Each structure stands twice: as C-alpha cells, then as structure tokens.
C-alpha cells in the first residue's frame, strides 16, 4: 500500500475512534438496550475473523501471517499461538483446540459465513480404552457452508493442536468403525453428499484419523446395526460428522496432503492410499466419482445471434426485450438497432463504470428532460439496464428545427435555446459504454463507431507524426478543418476523419446515386464564411431525406437546400470541387451491397469507415432517486402503542386513549419483553431499572412450570423442566401518557416542538425491546424518522466516479487539501478549484437532498447528546460546508455490513457519487414466470397458478416502487397467503406482504429433483436446504446433486382439492419420502442436477412473505426474492442509536443492518463486478478492429487493463484512468421530467409527443405497447380487485370480507367503506381509447378496449333506473 493510502485510512480510523469514544460514553449514560456501541469495527478480513469469533488477538496475528503464507498455512501456524496461550484465553486443552479449529474455519471462509460459529458445536477431550486421552470435535450441519477444504483442514488443525498438547490419538473400537460406515451411508441416502465414499473408505478414515469426528444427531432416521454405542450419543446420523468425513477428508485428501508433508508433529501417511484409490479396490463401484475433482458449470454467455454473413456488414442482432412491459409515462428513446438511435461508442469517462451509460447532456435536454443524471434506462445491450451519466466529450444529437435548419447540438446551452423549436430529432447522439460492461455481461463486442480516438491511431499507423500534430497550435485532431481532414486522408492513405464521415451505412445505393446526381447538378453561392461558398441543391424529397439520414448539417428552404462546408460530402460522392462527377457506374459488388459504404469507398479519393454501425435501442426505466428511507408508515420512535394511536400511530392520541369512561387514559396493553434487574429484582420492560438504574436482563420464565432459564451459548433458551423453548415476551399494561410526558421532560421539550410524534403498533424483535421514547421526540422535532434498527437513513441512486474537481462538488481546493488531497491526476500541486483529482476510495458525494437530511440528522444527534445523554454536542454544524470531512456509513445490501465513508462534496443531481469500490453490487434472485405457486387469494380461494399470474394481477406500475435495477415492488393491502415453512421444518401459513417483478438475467439455473420436480430460478436465488438439523438458506448456485430440498405434503387450511393436487405433485406414490421436523408434515426431495440454462424470458417474479420468507414453488419449499437499497447514515447516529435488539425476529430481519463495520475497503474482498472496470487512458487500435469482427470480450482481454489487474498491488487504490473527459458531472437536467410532470396523463402525453419527434421511434408501436402492457392489464387487474375487495373501517382500520349490514364497524362503530373505488378502476379507460384513436392503433387493440369499456359499464352503470322511451320497445 502506498504511504498516501495508509495516511488516508489512518485519518478515517482516527475520526472513527473519536466518534466511538463519544458514542461509548453516551451509551453508558442512556437507556439503550446495552451500554456499549453494538457495531464492531473490522478493518479487514482479519478483523472480521476476530469479530465473528470474539477471540482477542486473532486479527493482529492473522495480519502478521497474511503476507508470509497462504491462509491454509496461516491457519496451521495459528495453532501454536493457541496452544502456547499467545492468542485466546483458555484454561483447558479442549478450549485451546476449539479456539484453533474455529479460527481456522473462520480464516478459510474470510469471516463471512456462519460455519465457524454454528458448524462447530464444541471440542472435548475424552478417554481411550487404554487410559490415554483423545480429542473429539463435534460438528453440526452448518459446517457445510465452509466447503470441503475448510472442513478437512479443521480436522488437521485439531490433530496438530492435539499433537502439540501431547494428547494421544483417537483409538476407535471395532463397532464404532462399522457404525461410521453405516452412518455415512444412511446420511447419504437420506440427505445426500457431494461425494459418497465407499464403506471401505469410511472405515479406513475412521480407523486412521487421529481425531474423533463427532456431532449432533440430525433427522429422525436411525441406524439399524450399530446402535446404543457407549461413546456415540445418538443412534441417528451425525450430519456434520458425515460432511467432514466425506466431503472434507475423503474428497479433499490431495489438498490435505500438501500441508501434512510440512508438519513435523503430524503425519498422515494413510492419505496416500485414499489418493491412490486403492482402498476397497476389490469391491469398488465403477460409478464412484473422482475424489479429487471439483467441477463447475460453464457459463457460455448469451450473446445474441449476429450477422456475420460475407455478403452483409457484421452487425449485432437487434433485440426488443427492453421494450416489453412498456408503461405509460416512460418514453422510448430508440427502437431496436434503428437508425437515429443511440450510436455505440467505446470508452470510459471519470463518472462512468458499473452498469452506467454516458450520453451527451444536450441529448438529455432535447429528450424533453426525461433523462437526468442517474435515470435508469432499459437497454438493448450490453446489459439490460444502465444508469445515465453526462459526458460532454462525445457527440450530441442532430435535430431538424422548425425553420428548416439541420444542426448538430454539442452544447447544453444550445440545446436549451433550440428545444422549443425542434421539429424532429434525427439522431440522439452517442452512447458511451466501457469495455468492462461487455466483460461483466459476457456479451460479444458490437461494432464500434469510428471515433476520433480510433482515427488518430489509424493516422499514426499510416505514418503521420501524430505527436507533432498534437503539439501544433494550428491543429485540432478531434475537430480539424475540412481541408486538413481531406489532406491527411489523401497524403497518408488514411481514412477520412470521423467529423466528415457521414452515415453512409444508413442509406442505400439508390439514394447514394440520387444524391451524387443532385450534388453534380448543384451550384454554389458566395459566402462570407467559406471561400468555396455554399452548396445549393434542388429541394426534393429524396435529397432531403438522404441528407437527413447522413446527418449532414444544412438549411432547407422551400425550393433549395443549402449546405456549408460541403467539399468532404462532394468528394465522398465522387464529385470534384468544380462539381464534376468522376464516375459513371458502380461495380456489381458496390451496387449490390446493402448500404452505400462500398459505393463511397469506390468513388471517393480516400477510404471511408463505417461511422456508426451499432445503434442501441433503449427506453426509460425508473427515475433517479434521492430520498429518506422510512418505515411504512414512517415513525419517529420504536415504542409500541398498539391500536391506540389510530391509523396515524399518534403517540399523543394514544396517551389520551381510553376504551371506556372507566378506564385510565393512556393505559394500553402491549407486547413487550419482560426484564429483571439483577440488583433489586424489579421486573420491567425497560433496559434500565426504573428503581435503581442498573442495567436489566431478559427474564425467561416457563409459563407451564414457572422455571426460570437462561440462554445457552447459542442464544437458545429452553425450560430445564419441560424442554420447551422460551421467550421473555409478555403482555404488559403501559401508561403511554406517563411515558410520553416523561420523554418530553427527559429532553426538555414541549409538545409544540413538533407536529406529531409517531410510534409503532407493535415490536417485531425477539425480545421486543422498546426504544426510549425521548429519542423519538427529538427525531420528530428535527423532522427525521427511524428505520427498523433505530437509525436515520437516506437512500440515493448510486453512481460511480473516479476523479472530480473541487468546484463541481461545491467545495474549494483548500477544503480538499484539508481532506488530504495534495495533487491532481497529473501530479501537479492542488491549487485551483478546477483541477482534477482522483477520488479516494471511501469518499462520497452527497446529493443536495442528502446533505440537507444529514444536517437535520446532525442537529438531532447533537440534541440527543446534550439533552438526553448530558454530553457535549458532537457536530455543531451551521451549514452544509461543515459536513465536508464528516464520516458516514454506507450500507452495502445483503452483507449486513456498513462501510465507513467520508463526505467530500455535494451534487445537484439526485444521486450519490462514490468510487466504484464503495458501491456494493445488488443481488436480485427470483423465479421463472411459469413457476407454479400455491396461494390463497383475498376472497379465501386457493389457487395453483404461475407466479406471473399472481404478481401481474396485483402489480400497479403507477404505484409500485422501482429500485436501481428496474425491479418493480408492490406492497399488498389485501390478504394473500401462501404455504410456508419455518427453519425447524414446521409448515405454516404466511401473508404475502409484497409482489415484485424483475428484469431477467441472461442465465437461469434449472434445478431437477429425484421425484421429477423442476424449478428454474436465478443463480443467486435463495433456496432452502435440509441440513439434518434444520433448514438452511443457500444460493441456488451452491446446490449440488444429493442435496435435500424440503417439500410439503398439504396446503395448510381448507380445500380438499388443493391438498389433493399438492399431494399428487409432491409424491410419486411408490417411494415414501423422509419426514423431518417435530410434528411437521414437510418431506424432502433429492437434487439430481443443477444446470445453467439461457434465459428465454424478459422478467422473473417473486413474493415477499412475512416471517419465514418461504413459499411453495413447483412443489418445493424455497425462499423469496432478496433486495435492499443502498443508503447512507450519519456515523454518530449509527453508533449511538443502532441496536440489534430492535431488529425483526424473522428471516432477513438482520439484513441491511450494520452488524459489523468495515473501516477499510479491501479491493480483493469486494464483488467482482467492481473489478470489471477498465482503467486505461485509451483503447488500442486492435480493440476497435476486433469489435468489427464481433469478437468475444475475452479475446481482447490482453489489450485493455481492468481494475482487477491491480488488486493486491500498491496501485490497487489508484490509477483509475479514463478515456473520455466530462467537464462537469452535474451537467444535464437535475431532475427527470418524469418526476416534475404532474399526473400520469401528463407524463404519457409527453412520452408520446417525444415519440413523434424521434426518428428512431415508431410512435404507433409505443402507443400500442402502452395500451397492451400498461392500460389493459391495469384495467383488468383493477376490475378483478374491485370484485374481490375487502371493506375497511375508516376509523380503526378493521377489515371485513363483506360489508356489515349496518354499514358500521363492529369494533368501534365507525364508518365502513370500500377499499377499491370506481375511479381507481376505470381511471385509464378514456385515455386508452383516445390514444388508440389518435395514434391509429390496430383494430384488435381498439376492440379489446371496447370490450373492456362494456365490462366496466356493466359493473358501474345502474340501468335499473334508466328512463326508457317508447322507441326502446319498438
């Protein structure tokens, strides 16, 4: 690491230490759930290992060893530290061995999986029959997640520690040896193993392994032969033991041998017999797999079929996937590969990287501001979506104005000046994509535009002194004069400069001939700007359309067309300066070519390249995002008030609430955790004793026998008498009025300090610990809200940036120098605000909205410190300039880890800029649309339908939330339930909280089971796998043949048909499946294959299921979709207010919570997507030429440097070069028109009006798609919802399946009303009819709308009172 990088990280960590000191002092004085900060700091992987294990000294020793040896060798080296007491504090030999084994597994799994904690139960030192002692390691099912190598090395580590401690080897009895063989076979047949050892191999390992492999029982099956053995506690298979023996030692024997050879104290010569395969050779099974092989499915990519015919120019094949599911208000900017659409240009700007696309800011304005910085688009290639960033060094759009001018617009100011006069957008400009995007998406390279950076290399290769030309004050290589361009082309036999290379591939040969004739017949008029004058052509339709297609700037009059700077055009047409045509006929090859490129090269005096062979279609996805993250509904305090606060959850209302006149106002029964004071034995729900002020502990008392219990090492609480699981949750009556006014007094505030204080109806955490209400009072005062973990958060669309200027971040060079920025990217001293500097890896740029929110949060934190904790203010900020240099947390989704960042400046865009390494990649994992799921609908009826049907019927694009990757998420109001399963295998019925629809990836995984079930999901879909002692969560890509997947036998609830169908789906009737779980009805099915398949769909679907996050899909229990949004939070807010005690006690409840904090980003430990960013300052000529051959990205990997090449070197945090400049990262609209326009009708009208202007868009097709994909599904879904709706009390929120006859609520007497109204059902009907007529849609579409209109009339129009005339009966 460079000294400057080390200094940077030390600065961050010093600030973090200072904040920790204050936060620790605050927590000791308050009433938080614990007196300590609950977010441990991890600088690196070594810290994560120490934090996950809680063993002091591990991190420092791991760092010492990390640079000297491999992690496997380091794991073995650490054994001596544990044995000698240099690491850890253990009194027994068993403790030392256990610490060494856990640390080895944690080190080998980088501290990110549960195996070191949950996969190793304990270590014991027991007696052999000869009086010596041996070591027994007790493994559990979660050891599977460690992988075979870590499993095997954990045994080696245990043996190494055993030898160093002088403990003898394990000496198994004969019946124990045979028991192991029977047990492994039983486990393999019941649950499945990646490698199935022969009986002889199992007995051989058991006999020779110097450590006893033991473990807890898994499942209900029992061995038949060797039962009730003295030294084995169970007759059931020990799943952890079986995994370590089979998938660890037997499968990874060659790897283990590498390390045993280097250890004097340990000798495992018997491994060679395993490796040679001589064990049990006489009765070997021919089908036994190779123990030393590891195989992974090969991903062949999903490159579209492209045109490489010798008689056609090479082209990437058009794809219209991005157009499907088009919705109203989000415009199309180009149909697939259509002329006039975005022109592909390769390169990377400094504000460009992961899943982003650069466009000219003039384009953003001329597309009626629908594109703003951070706006997501759905795109044709290379990926499926991209965030828009402004790049003004590429070409902007070409437009035709109402006055007849055709102009290139390369200045945002010009775009604003002319946009009201634009009659047609002939070309939307260039579209910058970096090579790394093609690598990341495994997409073949599409033919590159002929851009100046390629032409310069061609000129250099042709023999020109390019450096001398660069140095000349009279030459601009990117924008030369026409005479210079033509001279270079002829003198050096180089292609014509791109500035004068027109889009000859966009016209055919007949148009070429007609234009050549027109130019030869033209004349010139004198001009003050050009000695050659202005070329004047006769105005004909053919000439006009051809010039527009070529993007030749000109002025159209009624009778003539006038072209300035016309000579390059004439020479390209084979016409001389004197307007003489030099050719009569074209060759057969040129005449038959699909476009005019060959014709041009045949008649011109220079070579002409294809200017823009690749057009990229795209449309708007979701708008950019910058807003606070709130719970739904937003709350200020995590204090429960039940239903007493009404629909607004108003604490003041709850404080006054009394069900009856005889009740005391504010006394509300709520579910909270029972806690006890260890000093005075007072029972309370508070974290601190109200009598003596001591910290309280959760009190677990059995409701049946009254026994009091305490949690074991795993956190589980079990009654010592009854054996039942216990919790500390009780219903207590709390005086909300007293709490409310006590909170006001505690912080010295009055009720007029805020408009409303909102609490929660109930707590979702395991111990139901309420937050001090005083914190909520101060949040309400400063208008910030609480997230589920007690923190205040702000969401922003993430965009990458690798270099910035102080000026564009609204800060000064002086402020940057205070942050440690001393040099610009060229190594010059930083003295001016406009110098470009490389952004540090953990520095972030906040949106204006985020900055304002952070200021309010800082004021809240300062008030909290001074008024609640009695400490000095920490921030004391006056304006947003004071935020520069302050530390924040950035939350990386799905990691439960926070990354420390530092505020470097601000942006007017609604995004958050940061280094690509700071932005964590998102995951989305979902189902194929044809996956059948069981669900009970709002009316109580059971269905077994494709998940697409369930989701689409309930998804409203207008109200659904859309994330950074275009996924639509719709919260459900109605009661939809699905069969679900708990971690213990208990079947249950759970509510569907939301439905979601996601862009499909290029590849899916097809999982097939032994019973013939098939499930197609995304590779990272959250599956459920039976481990032998419960159900674990695992990515689909981690499944292997033999894995046991849970499957139900019945649908909970009513419905014989449903149960019967599901039973027939789950069972084949001939082979009984295994039952597991105490009393559960779940059975398992064995995986036989997991294969990658190319995706043939545009979207995948998922559900959000309460509590368990599982559902039945194609007859298997599996997980739902995961996903969270990136956010930032102020450092001190997170340190003081975050508590694990507030997190929901459900699967996923700990996701998106800062359970650990990384103070340093290690590039080697982040997602590979961030490594696929090219960092060169130019692409080589060979790369551009390869694109014209549709090469695979890997074929040119040696030509371009990716960030991954610097990982692990001193340069891993620096050297992020870029090929294209951006004058300001805030250029273009600050907000998308989608967010500034009012109603959906306004947005849709703007969408269709833009389609009229764009040459690259067919407006009729857009109108058709809006009707087909948005309006009709919406009308149909709303009508269905109307017919199945519930009714709801307007006062208390009570729901009824049917309207009470009285019309009044049975609970509170309030008015009961419909939840779906006529206006929301037919809101798009009139608009859809108008659009269909105005844009001349197909008769089929119009007839569908007419039928829908009649259905609506039949439901909502009352014809019973319609007055009839006599003519109605004649």
Swiss-Prot record:
PANTHER family xref list: DNA POLYMERASE II LARGE SUBUNIT
EC number: 2.7.7.7, 3.1.11.1
Residue numbers spanned by region Disordered: 279-317, 1041-1081
HAMAP family linked: DNApol_II_L_arch (MF_00324)
Protein name (database record): DNA polymerase II large subunit
Catalytic activity as recorded in UniProt: DNA(n) + a 2'-deoxyribonucleoside 5'-triphosphate = DNA(n+1) + diphosphate; Exonucleolytic cleavage in the 3'- to 5'-direction to yield nucleoside 5'-phosphates
Function: Possesses two activities: a DNA synthesis (polymerase) and an exonucleolytic activity that degrades single-stranded DNA in the 3'- to 5'-direction. Has a template-primer preference which is characteristic of a replicative DNA polymerase.
Claim: NAD is one of the keywords in the record: no
Assembly notes: Heterodimer of a large subunit and a small subunit.
Keyword Nucleotidyltransferase: yes
Cross-referenced SMART domains: HintC, HintN
Molecular function (Gene Ontology), one example: single-stranded DNA 3'-5' DNA exonuclease activity
Post-translational modification: This protein undergoes a protein self splicing that involves a post-translational excision of the intervening region (intein) followed by peptide ligation.
Keywords: Autocatalytic cleavage, DNA replication, DNA-binding, DNA-directed DNA polymerase, Exonuclease, Hydrolase, Multifunctional enzyme, Nuclease, Nucleotidyltransferase, Protein splicing, Transferase
Organism: Halobacterium salinarum (strain ATCC 700922 / JCM 11081 / NRC-1) (Halobacterium halobium)
A GO BP annotation: intein-mediated protein splicing
Family: Belongs to the archaeal DNA polymerase II family.
